[in-house]
Amino acid sequence: MAVGLRRSDSIADMMPEALRQSRYQMKRCFQRYVSQGKRLMKRQQLLDELDKSVDDKADKDQLLQGFLGYVISSTQEAAVLPPFVAFAVRMNPGIWEFVKVHSANLSVEQMTPSDYLKNKEALVDDKWGAYDDDSQLEVDFGALDLSTPHLTLPSSIGKGAHLVSRFMSSKLTDNKKPLLDYLLALSHRGDKLMINDILDTVDKLQTALLLAEVYVAGLHPDTNYSEFEQKFQEWGLEKGWGDTAETCKETLSSLSEVLQAPDPINMEKFFSTVPCVFTVVIFSIHGYFGQEKVLGMPDTGGQVVYILDQVRALEDELLQRIKQQGLNATPKILVLTRLIPEAKGTKCNVELEPIENTKHSNILRVPFKTEDGKVLPQWVSRFDIYPYLERYAQDSSVKILEILEGKPDLVIGNYTDGNLVASLLTSKLGVTQGTIAHALEKTKYEDSDIKWRELDHKYHFSCQFTADMIAMNTSDFIIASTYQEIAGSKEKPGQYESHYAFTMPGLCRYATGINVFDPKFNIAAPGADQSVYFPFTQKQKRLTDLHPQIEELLYSKEDNNEHIGHLADRSKPIIFSMARLDKIKNITGLVEWYGQNKRLRDLVNLVIVGGLLDPSQSKDREEIEEINKMHSLINKYQLVGQIRWIKGQTDRVRNGELYRCIADTKGAFVQPALYEAFGLTVIEAMNCGLPTFATNQGGPAEIIVDEVSGFHINPLNGKEASDKIADFFQKCKEDLIYWSKMSTAGLQRIYECYTWQIYATKVLNMASIYGFWRTLDKEERQAKQHYLHMFYNLQFRKLAKNVPTLGEQPAQPTESAEPNRIIPRPKERQVCPFLRNLLKKETGNN
């Protein structure tokens, strides 16, 4: 597209002249838009109608390459209410403008997000979208963030901690007392940390820092803190500066720089050393959370693996930090999940379970309870979980305070349910909260906001989207795995961005839900467990005892319920893919690319790991379709002898060695998904040294630098993708070191950007920075917290009560399922007049 806009440009100002210049063609186009009555049109429909409206190819090309083509190509959707067409134009990630065009006279009017949403509502509910009805429930969280600094450039989205550091530096330039107060409040189990009450002014603190820095500079760098601890205390300095003279000197110098001339770099450096996080609580409530025999159970998958790896990394980082801070403290991490008495052979009925390969981390399971206090024995779908969450938060709070012997320093939620409970807990205890979505259901189901009534009986999206909004806006910081998760790409909004302005007609209109330019957004990409996924070249670590099993999986010639097909020519490299069998993962697409590309078939074999092999064994409609399609493609392209299809595998350890065995063949990993939010299998494959081809739609496009550390493929162009894979293997035949070069480059990319150690460092730095930010932003936060508390009490509670609960059966008495002490429900607050008017129709309050 030849035309672009600066952010200062307004589409509403520029569009009238553009319409005037192409008046004849655009009147025809807009007549086509409104000819079918009211409807919601997507970008491609708009472009198709434009194409049909202009007969002359030269005129059509000129239009598409001009300003109007830019606007329509940038439109995500348009609400057609004859004679008007309202456009939602996304000029860049996070940057939207709403305009309305009259189809007869082509007049243009700028719209607020709220006005656009009213038009959209009228498509499904005339009464709800009525312009003269101001009593409809409209929520505008952005109105409470006007004093909060925001990022301004799309390229800066996801770098919130950097902006917060800059803003804190600016505030401390004028007044350093808040930092002094923060340091004076630091303690652990009753012991003061870093400074004591002697240093009750900034001048005294700066003097003490100067004295201490000069003193430790004269010591041997390795001198233990205990040898000068008494001297520090005389100056008002307590433990926590470091374990040696050298580390103390660095921390003292960093704080001195912050106090003398605050700047973001020194601010971040200093807060990365502050001893403020010792205990962490992580909520992951739904499904069967455990360490064995749970993968493949309902609602149980990658989130469990993510959290267990996350915990190990966080504990390692905490132990290292505590040692470097010179403290004799023990970190504690609790993963809060649901205790399920009917555990189906898992350990989900065990209350407290140590996490393997950790020293101080445990899974704590707390049961769901009915209104009369009975333990709910059976599993509950993540879509039906909402009536139990408030009571769960209350019961969890009691257990957490008991086991940790105090408040946690950091609470992290996962998915909608975990994030909501984390919000309830942190609001009550006044501690720092981080949020991880994993998946936002609103983006999985097209138009699920305006069609929520059709889906609510099955998915209860009214509860889910409300809970998501509460958690996003309560949280101090939000952790995303990729930029695209937050703000998408040039063409497609991100998962969070789709919650900027949306409506659920008859329920609630979000004039501003969440703004991706909010500084709470940060990117911390997970890694793969490097004890499981390590390079194939590390021969001494290879799991050779698994090789007979893997040999059978890959090369045996018999078909059974574990694998079908065989590889006739074992000398050829293997291209390998492993994923669920559903349409979005596009495994059948890869098989079709392979079947259609003779050159690729001559160069390599294909191995697929995913799904079931027999459609009669699956209960998932989409998987059944994909299984049947796989069989059809194998027959259609006569792939027997060139393909091996292996049933989905859940043994991570064996899967790690399987990646390495594929690397032994000088093969490659292919991830062909139509869209992939992150791409953990891409990380796993690259960790094992496999050159990797991955979709350019989603997270893998950020993980891989194209043709440097791997290859991007377009899942919508199978010929181009398969040719790119074939070109690689052809080049490997001609250049004997090319395969090793790409393998090494992939590993280098992982070590620089995608390890759990890097992740843990980022998350704990966020906890420290946003923990201080809470104290600086306290007054501004308070108004929003009152708003959110009201919204929870008056909206979410009502919705949760409408979700049917399971038949209540008495649980078998077990020690771990004993009823906990019940915290009384908080009374509903009085609503201020401003909010009372906002909610009067929904709540009946006057």
From Swiss-Prot:
It catalyses: an NDP-alpha-D-glucose + D-fructose = a ribonucleoside 5'-diphosphate + sucrose + H(+). GO terms for molecular function: sucrose synthase activity. Sucrose-cleaving enzyme that provides UDP-glucose and fructose for various metabolic pathways. This is Sucrose synthase 6. Its EC number is 2.4.1.13. Belongs to the glycosyltransferase 1 family. Plant sucrose synthase subfamily. Disulfide bonds: none annotated. It comes from Oryza sativa subsp. japonica. GO terms for biological process: sucrose metabolic process. Keywords: Glycosyltransferase, Transferase. The keyword Membrane does not apply. The keyword Transferase applies. It is an enzyme of class 2 (transferase). It comes from the Eukaryota. Residues 276-755 are annotated as: GT-B glycosyltransferase. Pfam families: Glycos_transf_1, GT-B_Sucrose_synth, SUS_EPBD, SUS_N.
